[in-house]
């Protein structure tokens, strides 16, 4: 069975969402991120790629990078740009890219099920990248990017989602890259119970993207639950803050967005070579 839980998200103020929301941290270089966030102090890149606020050439894994991310994250909260919901809930998130549309469920997934293989993996992780995400989670006491999961579509869930997204969205904007983002929340007891029960019947979930994020979350969970506390889990600082970002404490959940397989679209992931090393294109082939 797949265990998904509602959570009290820390979300962008609706009218600021377009200025806050950004692409994932790992699809751009530091220089590209600096250009994208230039002149926009609300850009979430100040949190997800905080080296952009430090001198060029700063070691990406230096302690001051994570400290700057924490500082910027707390600033967005203090300014009211990010606000936490008062009650746990599920969230529905739609992306429209050209003619393609997909609607996923944003929820707290189980670190235990990740470790036991209920959440299926398909790739190995790089130690340096995994460690980077561990340190980012520990510094912020939050996860700032969801793990992208999928499951075999269930008709009852499809019908439930289709009904719910006819209501007025809470966030609705088109990003600079042309992708249209829309979000709704499911906070009523009946809706929450239905979603949890339907997923409890699903035998497994699959990671589509986010192996480093999920592995890092599981490591933080194991560390905290076994008593090897990070500096941020001192007495009085144990509140989990699953955000549009999300925190992992000893409760053992990680932020995920889960799409049915029927709406998934496989996109090319082409590599670009900067230097052929004196080889001709024919020789390279």
Annotated model-derived regions:
Residues 222-251:
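Intrinsic disorder/low-complexity segments
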Residues 1-225, 249-285:
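Surface-exposed, charge/polar-rich loops and edge strands
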């Amino acid at each position: 069975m797949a265990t998904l839980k509602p959570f009290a998200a820390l979300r962008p103020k609706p009218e600021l969402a377009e200025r806050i929301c950004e692409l994932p941290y790992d699809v751009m270089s530091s220089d590209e991120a600096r250009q994208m966030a230039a002149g926009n102090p609300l850009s979430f890149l100040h949190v997800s790629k905080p080296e952009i606020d430090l001198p060029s050439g700063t070691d990406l894994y230096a302690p001051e990078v994570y400290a700057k991310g924490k500082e910027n994250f707390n600033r967005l909260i203090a300014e009211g740009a990010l606000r936490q919901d008062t009650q746990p809930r599920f969230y529905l998130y739609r992306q429209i890219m050209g003619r393609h549309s997909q609607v996923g469920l944003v929820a707290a997934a189980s670190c235990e099920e990740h470790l036991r293989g209920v959440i299926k993996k398909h790739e190995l992780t790089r130690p340096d990248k995994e460690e980077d995400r561990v340190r980012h989670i520990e510094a912020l006491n939050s996860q700032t990017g969801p793990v992208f999961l999928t499951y075999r579509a269930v008709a009852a869930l499809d019908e439930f989602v289709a009904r719910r997204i006819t209501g007025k969205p809470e966030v609705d904007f088109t990003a600079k890259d042309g992708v249209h983002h829309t979000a709704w929340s499911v906070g009523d007891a009946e809706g929450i119970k239905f979603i949890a029960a339907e997923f409890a019947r699903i035998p497994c979930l699959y990671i589509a993207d986010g192996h480093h994020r999920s592995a890092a979350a599981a490591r933080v969970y194991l560390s905290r639950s076994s008593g090897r506390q990070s500096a941020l889990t001192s007495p009085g600082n144990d509140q989990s803050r699953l955000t549009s970002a999300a925190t992992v404490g000893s409760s053992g959940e990680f932020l995920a967005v889960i799409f049915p397989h029927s709406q998934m679209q496989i996109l090319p992931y082409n590599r670009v070579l900067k230097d052929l090393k004196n080889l001709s294109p024919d020789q390279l082939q």
